[in-house]
A protein has these predicted regions:
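Positively charged, small/polar-rich N-terminal and surface patches that mediate targeting and assembly
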Residues: 1-191
């Protein structure tokens, strides 16, 4: 497994420091940390007397070999394979916007870009939905109807709305919600 990947880790917010320390221990110095919230249905939360979970979302760029090492460490040290301890996954990176950006993201690890290859069979896929603020529950209702287990929401601001507004002739909301869901491949609708 070679290549460059965007690694995402989603955990409870109070576990962020633990993951960041773990990644630093494994030599990853360039990470992006942001916060989101879980999307468990309110009736499930009410039944267990829980509140909506605040989530930490950590992004980093890793090589295929680094991912193998990290995955083993995550399972052995963090016990990430136990439900409720977080989730980590990778997405292939097909391009990076310039030499300086590439060097920054690979942090001098000596990665040499090889030939591009097609995506191999995977059991899971990352579904990313960008919706106007306030529509997350509508998105999650549809996802749950298709048996998606849940997701993580990050509040964001849309950019480039001026061009889209000119094209559509209506004003567009700038406040967005980015919803990440990891789903089994067989549960994904065909495109």
């Amino acid at each position: 497994m070679s290549g460059l990947y965007m690694m995402a880790t989603i955990s409870d917010r109070n576990q962020a420091r633990r993951f960041l320390d773990f990644y630093r221990e494994y030599g990853l110095s360039v990470t992006l940390l942001t916060y989101g919230r879980g999307t468990a249905a309110s009736e499930i939360l009410d039944a267990f007397g829980l509140e909506a979970a605040e989530k930490a979302v950590i992004f980093s760029v890793v090589t295929g070999e680094e991912w193998k090492r990290l995955k083993t460490g995550l399972e052995r040290q963090i016990k990430i394979d136990i439900p409720g301890s977080g989730i980590a996954f990778i997405v292939p990176v097909s391009s990076i916007g310039g030499k300086k950006q590439f060097e920054f993201l690979t942090d001098g690890r000596g990665f040499v870009k090889g030939e591009e290859s097609t995506l191999k069979d995977t059991k899971y896929e990352l579904l990313v939905v960008i919706a106007n603020q306030g529509y997350t529950e509508l998105v999650m209702d549809a996802a749950r109807a298709a048996h998606a287990p849940g997701g993580t929401v990050i509040h964001a601001k849309g950019t480039g709305a001026e061009k889209a507004e000119k094209f559509f002739g209506v004003s567009l909301a700038k406040e967005k919600e980015v919803i990440f869901m990891v789903t089994r491949k067989e549960g994904k609708m065909p495109s």
